[in-house]
Regions:
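AMP-binding/adenylate-forming
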Residues: 122-131, 151-209
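Nucleotide 5′-phosphate-binding alpha/beta core
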Residues: 1-106, 113-133, 139-145, 197, ...
Length: 440
């Protein structure tokens, strides 16, 4: 049953990629309305929540999506059992678990208390089928029958229960795929040993973890020739994407997903920006640029107009370009990634991650901004050498950033590091960290 359903979903999703943008949008809004009716009939939360805004069942067929109130992670946390369409019970730790089989995805907790999201087996199959579509939608390397079963090396920094780990252990294994997991907590020598003579046709993981494999490849310690390099979980910088493509001679796919919707969209090495898959989610943006999602493939735990913390730029439904789906230029970051200071006039002002990410200095490998107080931040830097010219150029660019923002009152310190800080919960390396000191 599972393999048959998987094949059918692969075919359906592949066919959608050949439709027009108008067809895709018409089908997406129709699926959105079906999900509205399903949520009303099968959950306790939505009839009460929408009713408080004067929305009744008859309105669901005609109401504009923007007239339906958004929900947030906090709404899900406070009303968890009322979102589920299947019976739940609490385990010994007090966590809700489904009485019928379902996949449980944990949020990392990097933006608050961790939360679980439930997925049906069919929903997981849809996500897995979309990865097949994603792999062959373009690029210079095709995945053919002779490449099956898939052989993958995954460079990981988080444990079980997270989306990537679950897709690997539960997804790939069901289709007899072979996977080696390299954990960021292991010595690099162990990575080399575990890789051995394994010949993967896929590499996957956070960009920061895959960059370690890239270094090992450059040093001649491993020799990998994958067809596809799939990244996700962290922003993928253009120069690193180009290095992956060149060094591994592979197509690069920048996968975008989250615990609320495991498959949102993807960027790649063969087109600019990122496409959002409208046959998986109905996507919107609010006036501040927050992405609002309604997953269309997971009726077990319906999330209707769920507002993410992610900020996006260049949202467009026109379908111009390689694919007929909604397109965004880039993900700007999250609200909590923005660093707030006091400017020269004593008023609150911010440094946005998008501005900070413009720091481009030859010899500067990677960097991280750490806010210490309202007038001080550190820049932790990994540099190719101790050449003072590198630090001099960093200072020149930072001074210009602060001058343009009228924040020349802000002080900073450049600190040479051998490694950057990871978020202990998510395993990601954030660009910005708030680490304010008391009494400063």
């Amino acid at each position: 049953m599972s393999l048959i359903d998987f094949s059918l979903q692969c075919g359906r999703l592949w066919k959608n990629a050949g439709k027009s943008a108008d067809q895709i949008q018409t089908e997406s809004i129709a699926a959105f309305r079906r999900m509205l009716e399903h949520a009303w009939k099968n959950t306790r939360f939505y009839p009460a929540f929408w009713g408080r805004s004067g929305i009744c069942y008859e309105d669901l067929r005609v109401i504009e999506p923007g007239d339906i109130p958004c929900i947030t992670k906090e709404d899900v946390r406070k009303n968890y059992a009322d979102f589920s369409t299947v019976s739940l019970r609490k385990d010994r730790t007090g966590e809700w678990i489904p009485k019928k089989k379902a996949a449980v995805i944990h949020s990392s907790g990097s933006t608050g208390i961790p939360l679980q999201f439930l997925y049906s087996r069919r929903a997981m199959t849809m996500v897995e089928a979309n990865f097949v579509r994603l792999s062959n939608l373009g690029g210079k390397k095709r995945v053919g029958w002779r490449d099956l079963p898939i052989r993958n090396i995954h460079a990981a920094s988080v444990g079980e229960g997270y989306a990537s780990a679950l897709l690997l252990t539960d997804g790939l294994s069901r289709y007899h795929a072979k996977c080696i997991v390299l954990n960021a907590s292991e010595p690099l020598a162990e990575w080399v040993e575990k890789t051995g003579d394994f010949c993967p046709n896929f590499l996957s993981g956070y960009p920061s973890c895959l960059a370690m494999l890239l270094d090992l490849q450059k040093e001649g310690k491993i020799d990998l020739h994958p067809l596809k390099v799939i990244t996700g979980g962290e922003p993928l910088k253009e120069d690193l994407k180009m290095e992956f493509e060149k060094c591994f001679d592979a197509d690069v796919i920048d996968y975008y997903g989250c615990c609320e919707s495991l498959m949102v969209g993807a960027g790649s090495s063969w087109y600019q920006g990122m496409y959002l898959f409208d046959d998986m989610n109905y996507a919107e943006v609010d006036d501040k640029g927050h992405l609002i999602l309604t997953p269309l493939y997971n009726p077990l735990f319906p999330l209707i107009r769920y507002r993410l913390d992610d900020l996006v730029e260049g949202f467009s439904r026109t379908g111009r370009g390689e694919l007929p789906f909604t397109h965004i230029d880039r993900i700007l970051g999250r609200d909590e990634d923005i660093l707030w200071f006091r400017n020269e006039d004593g008023n609150p002002d911010f440094l946005h991650p998008l501005v900070l990410d413009d720091l481009n200095v030859k010899g500067l490998t990677s960097y991280q901004f750490i806010q210490k107080n309202d007038e001080l931040f550190y820049v932790d830097c990994i540099m190719e050498s101790s050449d003072p010219a590198i630090e001099g150029e960093i200072r020149r660019q930072l001074d210009e950033m602060l001058r343009r923002k009228k924040m020349q009152n802000i002080h900073y310190e450049i600190i040479h590091r051998s490694r950057l800080q990871r978020n202990p919960k998510s395993g990601k390396i954030p660009l910005t960290i708030r680490q304010k000191e008391s009494g400063r």
